[in-house]
């Protein structure tokens, strides 16, 4: 069959970007336009000739607009096969006219449920019924009907209509139909995820079923290694939709890689532990923090974080909890770093940093969401757990030794505990004056992690006397604690819970250490 000429269009959009201009062009080509509610008003107010959908259905919009396009004269006009004589006969007998073009986008359900103040009633009212129905009918009959869901496609449709005497090409109609089913499937999954979250709110633990939608946001050259394909996907689950662009904007530098994304997630997750606190700097390498410090100025915090490990920061990722000022930027600029992440860049800083073309500069535009689910793929299924976002306050600490920690020790212990949960297990972390002094990460033995942390401190001549130590899980034996005491530690923070806790406490008392239990483990695999 020849490509059908577009004579009648049905237009109903929530996102009115470019719709007036598009419909004005359609009208100029002789297309008869029918519309609904706010879209009709926008067109008529702009002087575009358009009629109410009620002139087709002979029925008013009712129930606060919930019922307006669910009618045989609409769906018959969309679904009728033009080459089928029986369809044409039935359409004629029932006063149904063909509709050649459908321009519809859906109620903004995902944006609505992403609002922190959204109510269940608001969410339900933003579930579109008529829109998906029209889109699916039009897309099913793509032999005859052109269907548009995205304002970015308006120009393509107009161009083809001009070049083909008012018609669109078959390949274009098929491509646009594909976009419909991708859109409606994602839309339905978002609704199902939200409702699953509502049900889960009445339940304990993870739901028996979860609906998760992944939509590619960014292509990547490769994954962790050049032989691995990769991409970044926008994720929609019961907590709404999350994407890189919701929280970050790359201002300068090469495209972000798979490994860059992992490091950004690690660096920002840690720096947000210190949101609103004194100037803090986090340096990350291969997702592990290699230096973290607080100080009166950002520049001083950076220098102190860098002094923890003066080799690892080269090619690393640095995040800041304050706008990056010129003094700190000049200090950072002395070495090559892959990525700098800040909530803002003060005047002149970007211009200076952009002189190194390969360095990525990333603006954090919003805080990362707290809580929700964390997904980890395995060859045999998907592991799902709550994010490790619970906070331990000073009031939650239980002092288990004879000696109480001093206020200065408590400040260092709390600082260390915030960092500890962001380091790969087994973790031993030494901290002094709100600066990491030795990081022992990712070892199979807690004793080995302790040895590495002490060795790293000695490599840069950091004196551990007067420091505190944090362990992400309990000390199974007293040996790890005794090694810390030998290094000069005065206070310890750990979850507790070992069957040998009493032995560890006795060892702490024997060495005049103050030790607190958090009652919360922070394994990180």
UniProtKB/Swiss-Prot annotation:
Q: Name one GO cellular component term.
A: cytosol
Where the record annotates domain MGS-like, the positions are 1-149
- According to the record, the segments passing through the membrane are none
Q: Give the EC number(s) listed in the UniProt record.
A: 2.1.2.3, 3.5.4.10
UniProt KW keywords = Hydrolase, Multifunctional enzyme, Purine biosynthesis, Transferase
Query: Which pathway does the record list?
Result: Purine metabolism; IMP biosynthesis via de novo pathway; 5-formamido-1-(5-phospho-D-ribosyl)imidazole-4-carboxamide from 5-amino-1-(5-phospho-D-ribosyl)imidazole-4-carboxamide (10-formyl THF route): step 1/1; Purine metabolism; IMP biosynthesis via de novo pathway; IMP from 5-formamido-1-(5-phospho-D-ribosyl)imidazole-4-carboxamide: step 1/1
Cross-referenced PROSITE patterns, in alphabetical order? MGS
Catalysed conversion reaction: (6R)-10-formyltetrahydrofolate + 5-amino-1-(5-phospho-beta-D-ribosyl)imidazole-4-carboxamide = 5-formamido-1-(5-phospho-D-ribosyl)imidazole-4-carboxamide + (6S)-5,6,7,8-tetrahydrofolate; IMP + H2O = 5-formamido-1-(5-phospho-D-ribosyl)imidazole-4-carboxamide
The UniProt entry, under SMART domains, shows: AICARFT_IMPCHas (SM00798), MGS (SM00851)
GO BP terms: namely:
'de novo' IMP biosynthetic process
SUPFAM superfamilies, sorted:
Cytidine deaminase-like, Methylglyoxal synthase-like
Write down the superkingdom of origin.
Bacteria
Name any one GO molecular function: IMP cyclohydrolase activity
UniProt note: domains: The IMP cyclohydrolase activity resides in the N-terminal region.
Assigned protein family: Belongs to the PurH family.
What name goes with this protein?
Bifunctional purine biosynthesis protein PurH
Say which species the protein is native to.
Pelodictyon phaeoclathratiforme (strain DSM 5477 / BU-1)
Q: Which gene encodes it?
A: purH
